[in-house]
Amino acid sequence: MERAVTMTGIGGQGIQLIAKLMAEAGMREGRQVMMFGMFGGMIRGGSSESTVVLADDEIVSPPIVPEVWAVLAMHPEGVAKVTPKVRPGVVLVRNAPMVPPPRDWSGAKDVAIPATDLAKSMGQPLGAGMIALGALVEATRIVGLSSLVDALTGVLPPHRQKHIAANRECLERGAAWVREQGTAAETAAWS
């Protein structure tokens, strides 16, 4: 079984970091993993997208991803770009209200988490991406939350290691929000 998750936003929202974190967590769980990211020339504010493919078996390299199983959208700019790859029943974790519900995604499982607002309320304004990732993981079980937390030390560069506890709290807050709202997907990623 193979699952493709596309994460989209703008530069400065941590899209490449959260994709790398999910990929690392998947490897720690014994999955085959491939990640590829694309971003604009601007460091902050340009488009940023990354797709992580996780599988039980070998991944054909490079993978052609005609459909995505889940989307994490932090900014409305990227939603239109990923729309052609959306399959029926896609899981959409979106940073609400910044990212409105897409009109043409019929049957999508919509997890509208106020990630930016939650991050600000925690005193972690840069933690919205981690909150959304925690929500995605709780809603889909694509990887375990504990695997994400364990992967933080391997993914964060040395000068960011001091932020491990804050990132862990953001991941846990996103997962807790999904549990509180009862917005978990009906089927887990690997069932």
What are these regions (language model features)?
Residues 1-191:
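Active-site cofactor/cluster-binding pocket
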